[in-house]
A protein has these predicted regions:
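Preference for long, amphipathic alpha-helical scaffolds in soluble/luminal domains
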Residues: 1-300
Length: 300
């Protein structure tokens, strides 16, 4: 499992294993070093996650009603979604407070069709949003919830119907971010053979696109926390579903590798202003972890 390290220009693993960020340490031990869930250090790192500063801050900011910042309403739940996305990404086990927030998203933002919507109406079910929600809910332990299964199946139908990935918020132009969101969402759930044709199509869309990282796709190199629609997210989804051996993948991987510094770290170039996880313009443990996980998936 260690041969992926040959791609590194420096070993950043000791840095990722430092105890100041137990979530990063936990994922590094588990996903990069291959430690099992019963490993003593893995268990210790996981137990420390709820005590970390950012997790405590986010949970402390939750309102008694279960939402964050804005009152509960049928609209895009910016703060609530972001809070839960960060908690999910940090590997926080769902507790009563988190479950209360999740129920608000189900109640206000899942349409009867199963899709998740910004507005409560089906017209607000953008191609990227259900994928984002599947990612969060899958990582929070809701993969087997009937509402998530309904969303999963409705999302397959939506993506088949809009195979051109036209986005209503962008003059109906193809939205590669939707492809990233979908791959990321389905990667967080148990394998679903019924979705394989859609996954293959989305992967092909990402692999055949003519990228201009100095122009239109420059924002794809603005890696940040929580993970957004960027090159690392695209590569992670592609690698998860078995496309790492594709030559076109290799070219994109070289672009990602070109963004590391001399110490083998990647920078945080974007962050969410509602809950600041890391400092912009500084080496990022989270971005570095994400990049190294892509390499590990390529070699696994």
């Amino acid at each position: 499992m260690d041969d992926w390290k040959s791609k590194l220009n420096a070993d950043s693993l000791p840095w990722l294993l430092e105890p100041d960020n137990p979530s990063v340490r936990h994922f590094t031990l588990r996903d990069l070093l291959g430690r099992g869930k019963d490993d003593r250090e893995v268990r210790a790192a996981k137990a420390a996650i709820p005590k970390s500063k950012i997790v405590r801050e986010i949970l402390a900011a939750q309102k008694p009603g279960g939402y964050w910042e804005e009152a509960e309403k049928k609209s895009w739940p910016t703060h609530t979604y972001v809070a839960l996305a960060i908690l999910a990404g940090h590997g926080v086990a769902p507790n009563a407070k988190i479950k209360k927030g999740v129920e608000i998203l189900f109640r206000n933002n899942q349409h009867a069709s199963g899709l998740f919507t910004w507005t409560g109406a089906k017209s607000g079910a953008l191609l990227c949003f259900t994928g984002d929600m599947l990612f969060v809910l899958g990582h929070l332990g809701y993969a087997d919830d009937s509402r998530v299964r309904q969303a999963r199946d409705a999302y397959v139908a939506q993506l088949r119907a809009k195979s051109d990935l036209g986005c209503s918020r962008n003059a109906n132009k193809p939205c590669l971010w939707a492809a990233i969101a979908a791959l990321r969402g389905y990667a967080a759930l148990p394998p679903n053979p019924a979705a394989r044709d859609v996954i293959d199509h989305l992967a092909n869309v990402l692999l055949t696109h003519k990228y201009d990282f100095a122009g239109a796709e420059k924002p794809w190199l603005r890696f940040g926390v929580p993970a957004g629609f960027d090159l690392i997210a695209a590569l992670d989804g592609l690698a998860h579903f078995g496309f790492a051996r594709d030559k076109r993948f290799g070219k994109l991987l070289d672009v990602m590798l070109g963004e590391r510094d001399e110490a083998g770290r990647w920078m945080c170039r974007s962050f969410n202003t509602k809950f600041v996880v890391e400092k912009r313009g500084a080496p990022s443990k989270w971005v570095t972890l994400r990049a190294l996980k892509v390499l590990a998936k390529c070699k696994s």
